[in-house]
Amino acid sequence: MSEKHPGPLVVEGKLTDAERMKLESNYLRGTIAEDLNDGLTGGFKGDNFLLIRFHGMYQQDDRDIRAERAEQKLEPRHAMLLRCRLPGGVITTKQWQAIDKFAGENTIYGSIRLTNRQTFQFHGILKKNVKPVHQMLHSVGLDALATANDMNRNVLCTSNPYESQLHAEAYEWAKKISEHLLPRTRAYAEIWLDQEKVATTDEEPILGQTYLPRKFKTTVVIPPQNDIDLHANDMNFVAIAENGKLVGFNLLVGGGLSIEHGNKKTYARTASEFGYLPLEHTLAVAEAVVTTQRDWGNRTDRKNAKTKYTLERVGVETFKAEVERRAGIKFEPSRPYEFTGRGDRIGWVKGIDDNWHLTLFIENGRILDYPGRPLKTGLLEIAKIHKGDFRITANQNLIIAGVPESEKAKIEKIAKESGLMNAVTPQRENSMACVSFPTCPLAMAEAERFLPSFIDNIDNLMVKHGVSDEHIVMRVTGCPNGCGRAMLAEVGLVGKAPGRYNLHLGGNRIGTRIPRMYKENITEPEILASLDELIGRWAKEREAGEGFGDFTVRAGIIRPVLDPARDLWD
């Protein structure tokens, strides 16, 4: 993250095919509407396969049965993933009841998947149900616009802060930023909601006709919680409060975790501090960061197109000066803040307004009725009686927010009867995985289906070494794109091949340091053997309050990553 070797502001060369597709799409319409009526295939063809991502969907198939279907000369069982736009993760109980019904009646898997980007996904939507899902969302005030592809994705906001008033203010800014950076094209409304075509020319004053060079992620974070993992994101607004009231933000730009195995031109990167801005400049600054990345981001190589690479190429100070010029402001020096953790506080927490918040641990965010644990039914029953709202956290958990004292017992009874309040270890509470197999086309190794039994084994090691009341931030991601945020964990597993992972160590508990690869392409028994030895050493040799990741660095087990653009692969 230095100013060495600043490169050109704009990368010249042959544009990627994605740029052609966006330019020719007529502001994201393509021929999606016509494709919907093609019953010969369960999928979308040509450019539409990628264009539907701008409308919040990915085309997938069930990889567990892919080979079997190929033998039967059948096409893969195509189905869509849909990701809702839900700034800050807040969803009403009426909206919850609607999504519960749709998941149960109209998806292959019948589940609601909470994600670590504070929203929910439906997996397994057949083509005939694609239009109905958008119409269902619209009927309850939701949409899936811009939750995938080259736009500003779902805006995150710290979900369970210590001060409810501060959360309310920060959440409003998350919503404002999300709305301000949305695409202006009417394609979504025309295709999915049957709204009339208006005889005006589409314009995209912020995103431009070819949108952004690559995905773009934004957060609003309230210290001391770093639950949203700001360093995984392109643009981050750190809330600065005086006397409990929000007065402005520190801006950090250029975080991101995605890498490619063996490609040393790719790297995870923590975000760079730009400085402090008063509240009234928030939207202008957000727009300036996005338009600078729009104009300077690399459109000739998608693997080098994210904001983190733009910052490294042009230099942090050059990018920052351009943001100041476009926004018409000068950043003040960053105000002090600190992070103390990023896990959710599971169980009841009292807010300052005498209401209570109940955070429920949802392993891997997968809401389904399991034998003896009817999680989905339990949450539906709570949604029917709860007067407040639900909040999805960036740790894939769910908060029943704003519960009056008089309603606590009733809600707790349902939660306990449904298995939503079963006791779990601190280690399980602080472990996370992406979806991976069977639905993700990029998956190289299991993640969500691997994690529960893997954590059983880790729990046994924690007991063996006398540290079962503590935790290590542990994450599994099925491929190096990094949706499981393993590259900000104390122990990160990155899928390499079926049953094999790269083991990364040396991140820290608060998520401000990238971990380094410790062992490559190893199996679960090999991972457990390494961690058995290292957890044993941590238990015996650590200093007071020292987290596992900090210990591995101090003990010389792993070298810290100091400047990931230059030393991640050393």
From Swiss-Prot:
Checking PROSITE patterns in the record gives:
NIR_SIR
Which residues are noted in the entry as siroheme-binding? C483
Q: Which GO terms describe its biological process?
A: cysteine biosynthetic process; hydrogen sulfide biosynthetic process; sulfate assimilation
UniProt source species = Shigella flexneri serotype 5b (strain 8401)
Q: Which cofactor does it need?
A: siroheme; [4Fe-4S] cluster
Q: Does the keyword Cytoplasm apply?
A: no
Subunit and partners: Alpha(8)-beta(8). The alpha component is a flavoprotein, the beta component is a hemoprotein.
- Molecular function in Gene Ontology: 4 iron, 4 sulfur cluster binding; heme binding; metal ion binding; NADP binding; sulfite reductase (ferredoxin) activity; sulfite reductase (NADPH) activity
According to UniProt, the name of this protein is Sulfite reductase [NADPH] hemoprotein beta-component
Q: List the Gene3D superfamilies hit by this protein, alphabetically.
A: Sulfite Reductase Hemoprotein, domain 1 (3.30.413.10)
Biological function: Component of the sulfite reductase complex that catalyzes the 6-electron reduction of sulfite to sulfide. This is one of several activities required for the biosynthesis of L-cysteine from sulfate.
Tell me which UniProt keywords the record has, alphabetically: 4Fe-4S, Amino-acid biosynthesis, Cysteine biosynthesis, Heme, Iron, Iron-sulfur, Metal-binding, NADP, Oxidoreductase
